[in-house]
């Protein structure tokens, strides 16, 4: 489910700029098409990277993924910016470390791949490392509950990311999708310092002789 209204609101500042966009989970290519039209077609130096295996997942067992992949590839072929649409037909566990090792950074990242919490968390941590300052990270399906228990949904992972990265993110929107902006890190909290108290020496209750004996080697 793609929230075009929120995208238009929070991504408009990137239009016409040489942005780098990453999508984890391309599926039919609907978001890829939107990214191409709104960003790549407006700047010859803008690039899109899409990661997907088109092999399916536990929540999608009755879908023809060959047809889904073909739909995405058809969108790429028809795009005026097709030479700057880079498809990585790999799992995110393989593709994201590859991108990270190349030092590629992104202005916009959209995560909509595996819905399993541990997978979403893995993708998000790597993506945060590739997201530029003032870049935007979008999570899809925050409120998705098709599978039980909750560890098979994105929400626990997204909640964890918002908590862990709280000092360096701004929550732009939270609904079925969550949109975060990476900002300069805020001051990290420090341990509260107690007021200095006067130290008072108290006489030991151990007899002097015993103290002396206990220290004899």
List the predicted regions and their residue ranges.
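S-adenosylmethionine/decaboxylated-SAM
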Residues: 2-199, 203, 207, 211-217
């Amino acid at each position: 489910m793609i929230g075009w209204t929120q995208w238009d609101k929070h991504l408009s500042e990137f239009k016409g700029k040489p942005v780098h966009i990453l999508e984890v989970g391309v599926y039919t290519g609907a978001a890829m098409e939107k990214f191409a039209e709104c960003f790549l077609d407006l700047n010859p130096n803008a690039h899109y990277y899409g990661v997907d295996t088109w092999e399916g997942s536990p929540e999608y067992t009755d879908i023809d993924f060959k047809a889904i992949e073909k739909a995405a590839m058809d969108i790429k072929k028809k795009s005026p910016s097709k030479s700057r649409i880079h498809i990585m037909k790999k799992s995110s566990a393989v593709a994201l470390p590859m991108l990270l090792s190349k030092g590629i950074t992104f202005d916009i990242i959209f995560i909509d791949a595996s819905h399993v919490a541990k997978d979403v968390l893995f993708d998000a941590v790597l993506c945060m490392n590739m997201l530029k300052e003032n870049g935007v990270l979008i999570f899809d399906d925050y409120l998705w509950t098709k599978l039980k228990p909750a560890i098979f949904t994105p929400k626990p992972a997204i909640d964890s990311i918002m908590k862990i990265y709280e000092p360096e993110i701004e929550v732009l929107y939270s609904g079925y999708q969550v949109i975060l902006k990476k900002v300069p890190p805020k001051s990290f909290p420090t341990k509260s310092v107690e007021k200095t108290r006067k130290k008072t020496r108290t006489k030991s209750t151990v007899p002097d002789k015993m103290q002396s004996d206990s220290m004899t080697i």
